[in-house]
Amino acid sequence: MFSIEFGLTFAILFFKGHREAQERLEPLMTKIDFKKTQKALYLPSAKTIELIDVPPMQYAMIDGKGPPGNDTYIATLGWLYPVSYGIKFRSKLELKQDYVVPPLEGLWWAEDYSAYTSDRRDEWLWTMMIRVPDWIDQTIFDACVTKAAIKLGNSPATLRLETLHEGQCAQIMHIGPYKDEGPTIAKIHNQFIPDHGLIENGLHHEIYIGDPRKTAPEKLRTVLRQPVRERETA
């Protein structure tokens, strides 16, 4: 549903030289890839909606409003990627723990749900975020924000390090263009959740797997996740 090409390009250009230098320094360091160590969170079935227990995880987050691709959205990605790569490099150099920067994720909602069904994108609300390993503390996060600000200027007011605990969730992998997610999302909300005696318990969550600049639209992979809880009975 949502474009992330600008943010990816910005991050690559911003940190290309730094990244190459650091990789030469520690060529034998083990690199953790959460997509491989926690496959259930990032690579669910594309055929069947599943229930999964999602543990608490911390993220670099920024809030915004409006259609993806507007100035606020582009500026958000222009901050999230540099800060996230800055954290990765500091973790590698100072803590001797290397990892693959996790994929971009987004929480999406609207004060009036019909804003989605009628495609009133100016009313869309969102939080874009990138996972930060649990061994990273606020001090390191703040230092990376300060460093990014040298080139980017004042940081967004909502840029923060925050823990998200979704708990039980329904999720499935959507394969195809972002704009074609609608029927799958509807199936989660209108069929799977009520059929299992559940109700929504959080915001619609998307995880964008892979690089949309290098992937044909029909092969794009997006995790569609909805926190749920048991429906109370009288």
Give a label for each model feature:
Residues 9, 14-28:
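Short, Lys/Arg-enriched N-terminal segments with co-localized hydrophobic residues
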Residues 25-234:
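A solvent-exposed interaction/effector surface
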